[in-house]
Design a protein with these regions (language model features):
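N-terminal Sec-pathway targeting helices
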Residues: 1-17
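Short, C-terminally biased terminal segments at protein or domain edges
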Residues: 18-28, 41-43, 72-74, 82, ...
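Repeat-blade elements of multi-bladed beta-propeller folds
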Residues: 25-31, 60-71, 97-119, 138-172, ...
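Ser/Thr/Pro/Gly-rich low-complexity linker/stalk segments immediately outside membranes or between
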Residues: 28-52
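Blade/loop signatures of beta-propeller domains
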Residues: 53-90
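A structural motif specific to WD40 beta-propellers
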Residues: 91, 129-132, 181-184, 220-223, ...
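Short amphipathic
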Residues: 93-95
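Short loop/turn segments that connect beta-strands within beta-propeller blades
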Residues: 124-128, 176-179, 215-219, 255-259, ...
């Protein structure tokens, strides 16, 4: 072969290899940044009942207005009949001295919240004064949940929690909400999930790669369900089925009484978000930058919407719209049927925590420590507050309670 042919052969080989590298690189990029899959409102889409349409009795709501992370068993983050709108006056504020990574629950005239440095507080809802405080030697990075006159708080690994030892023990502690006295505890791996009580069963996930169902009367596990990786997000419940996700890139639906698998579905990266159940669908964000909609009964992928950044945020739902934030610094209102964008809002900072919808206003915070209240129909900015970082807002029928970075606020709607 002549020298010229050698050169041409080498050039051709380089071009082929270069093309192969380019294709491989494109495939890797696509896997890490998958695109949008548009859905349809004609497939597995139930519109006969809005989230919150089957409400709890009024006397129960007055007693326990915000019982769990995400407000209800379906984690819809929409509270019907809570007519509290901006502008607000700060009625009280309370320093906690440590990060509030997850929002409080509200019951019995008190606001219950855990701090990252292991303190669990009961705060008077009207005055902001501490009623009691219980200190643990473990970090807290999850909301509590209310049962029948018992409040359950998850605990992570021992201090310093930043070491995150994978084999460390964690607990869910049952506490008397009136006195703060510990009633009993259940040991598992590290518990970062916000638990849920349905009937006599307490559900939560753990870093030991399992979902647990614990009988609150016997304090024993009724069943456990193994996954392929850590379970960091909380479960949701609807129609006898428990829905949850794992860091093994999967969403699971299991029989809530037996733990038997009904279906599983996959994403292309980790699921940190807690699922939201509405309209016959399961809505959940993924660190691949997409929001997914799966069929509640089938597990079929119905749509996936790319947001341009990680989606750690759990979703809120209201009036056939899915509300969710992204690390792309944008907050989205998506059509629950198709996944199409109804509107989006440039928040100026990455969004990690979950939104809340109250009286037509959707609230969320950015990692820049700013909270927004937007018109949920149009995306118009109605209100801002210079604190808040993760999932900021819960409420009762008199006030909004805002979890700031290291402060808790009681906000009263302005008269008129």
């Amino acid at each position: 072969m002549t020298r010229r042919r050698w050169i041409l052969a080498i050039v051709a080989l380089v071009l082929v290899l270069g093309a192969g590298v380019a294709v491989a690189g494109y495939v890797v990029w696509q896997n890490r940044h998958p695109g949008t899959i548009r859905g349809s409102s004609t497939v597995e889409f139930e519109t006969t009942e809005e989230p919150g349409a089957t409400t709890r009795p009024e006397e129960v709501v007055r007693k326990v207005p915000w019982p769990t992370y995400g407000y209800d068993e379906q984690r819809t983050r929409y509270a019907p009949g809570f007519d509290v709108r901006p502008p607000f006056t700060t009625e009280w504020e309370k320093g906690t001295g440590s990060l509030l990574e997850f929002p409080p629950v509200v019951a019995y005239g008190r606001v219950y919240v855990g701090t990252n440095d292991g303190r669990f507080l009961a705060v008077d809802a009207e005055t902001g004064k501490t009623v009691w405080q219980k200190t643990f030697d473990r970090c807290i990075a999850a909301s509590a949940t209310m049962g029948e006159d018992v409040i359950y708080q998850p605990l992570m690994d021992p201090f310093p929690c930043r070491e995150h030892k994978q084999d460390a023990a964690g607990y869910v502690v049952a506490i008397d909400p009136d006195t703060g006295r510990e009633l009993w505890r259940f040991e598992a791996g590290v518990v970062e999930t916000s638990p849920l009580v349905v009937g006599n069963l307490l559900y939560f996930g753990s870093w030991d790669k399992k979902m647990y169902a614990v009988d609150v009367n016997s304090h024993k596990a009724v069943w456990t369900f193994p996954t392929g990786d850590q379970v960091k997000a909380g479960p949701a419940y609807a129609r006898g089925t428990l829905y949850f996700a794992s860091y093994d890139n999967k969403v699971y639906a299991v029989d809530a009484r037996t733990g038997k698998l009904r279906w599983s579905a996959s994403g292309t990266a980790n699921f940190y978000a807690t699922p939201t159940i509405a309209y016959g669908r399961v809505f959940i964000g993924n660190t691949d930058g997409r929001v997914y909609a799966f069929g509640q009964d089938s597990g079929h992928l119905l749509w996936a919407k790319a947001t341009g950044g990680y989606v750690y945020s759990s979703a809120a739902v209201w009036q056939k719209t899915v509300y969710v934030g992204s690390y792309s610094k944008r907050f989205y209102a998506l059509d629950a049927g198709s996944g199409d964008v109804r509107w989006s809002f440039d928040a100026g900072g990455a969004i990690s925590g979950a939104p809340t919808v109250l009286d037509g206003v959707v609230y969320f915070s950015t990692l820049e420590r700013k909270t927004f209240g937007l018109d949920a129909r149009t995306g118009k900015k109605l209100w801002t507050f210079d604190d808040g970082k993760y999932s900021p807002v819960v409420a009762d029928k008199e006030r909004v309670y805002l979890a700031g970075y290291k402060r808790l606020y009681g906000l009263l709607p302005d008269a008129g």
